[in-house]
């Protein structure tokens, strides 16, 4: 009888990979909640690019001033850091709720803008909350799910933001035909308020934040703390990748409908 080859023995002795831990009912609910909230984040963030030609015509803007408007609103993407920073002090639950309610309210106010100045201001503040929601949703996903499931959860939530942008591009041509025109695109953004009213009671603080809330060693939550950790190089590498990616793609995405269609 032939003896087993070393390779077959090695394969036989190798432990089978463990199945990922099943998600709890709360984790499944949280997965759905974060996905829906981030879907509307993607929808609202992409709305300006979709309505820009109509907005220019309605408010009498030339392409140069339209570009300045987009740049001004995009400053909110940077200012979102100061909202996300509060999550380390006030808690993830409180800040996530604030960001969702914030971007909903300012998207609604955008629909009632009377001139380009009020539109620009509403969009700047809305983007602070939009990017804040996205960042805190990622924190929730990182802290509330086991390592074996974390990549899948984060990937699906991020995909929902892209799906929101795709849906925005699909429905905008129809919404522009309504009596409200481009304003109706932002009126749709009030839907998250209904979600918050129904679902907020089930949202919990993350276990990690609750555990570390009274820990003296974890109270240094300043930005400078990153410079004193082993991960500082990785943080700046990822920041550079994101900055270069957006630098290359943002203009193309924002002005695609203006010049390519």
Predicted feature residues:
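Central cavity-lining transmembrane alpha-helices of secondary-active solute carriers
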Residues: 70-85, 138
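Conserved MFS/SLC helix-loop-helix module at the cytosolic interface between two early adjacent transmembrane helices
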Residues: 78-117
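Cytoplasmic helix-loop-helix junction between adjacent transmembrane helices
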Residues: 121-159
């Amino acid at each position: 009888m032939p003896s087993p080859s070393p390779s077959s023995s090695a394969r036989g002795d190798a432990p089978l990979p463990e199945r990922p831990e099943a998600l709890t009912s709360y984790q499944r609910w949280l997965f759905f909640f974060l996905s829906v909230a981030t879907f509307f984040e993607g929808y609202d963030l992409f709305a300006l690019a979709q309505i820009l030609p109509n907005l220019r015509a309605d408010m009498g803007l030339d392409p140069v001033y339209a570009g300045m408007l987009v740049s001004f609103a995009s400053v909110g993407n940077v200012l979102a850091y100061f909202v996300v920073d509060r999550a380390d002090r006030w808690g993830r639950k409180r800040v996530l709720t604030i960001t969702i309610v914030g971007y909903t309210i300012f998207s609604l106010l955008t629909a009632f803008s009377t001139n380009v100045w009020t539109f620009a201001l509403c969009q700047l503040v809305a983007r602070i909350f939009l990017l804040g929601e996205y960042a805190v949703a990622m924190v929730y996903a990182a802290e509330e799910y086991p390592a074996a499931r974390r990549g899948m959860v984060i990937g699906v939530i991020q995909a929902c933001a892209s799906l929101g942008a795709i849906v925005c591009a699909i429905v905008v041509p129809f919404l522009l035909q309504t009596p409200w025109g481009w304003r109706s695109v932002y009126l749709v953004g009030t839907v998250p308020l209904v979600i918050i009213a129904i679902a907020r009671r089930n949202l919990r603080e993350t276990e990690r934040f609750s555990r570390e809330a009274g820990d003296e060693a974890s109270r240094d939550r300043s930005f400078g703390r990153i410079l004193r950790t082993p991960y500082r190089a990785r943080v700046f590498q990822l920041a550079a990748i994101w900055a270069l990616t957006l630098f290359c793609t943002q203009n193309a995405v924002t002005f695609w409908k203006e010049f390519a269609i």
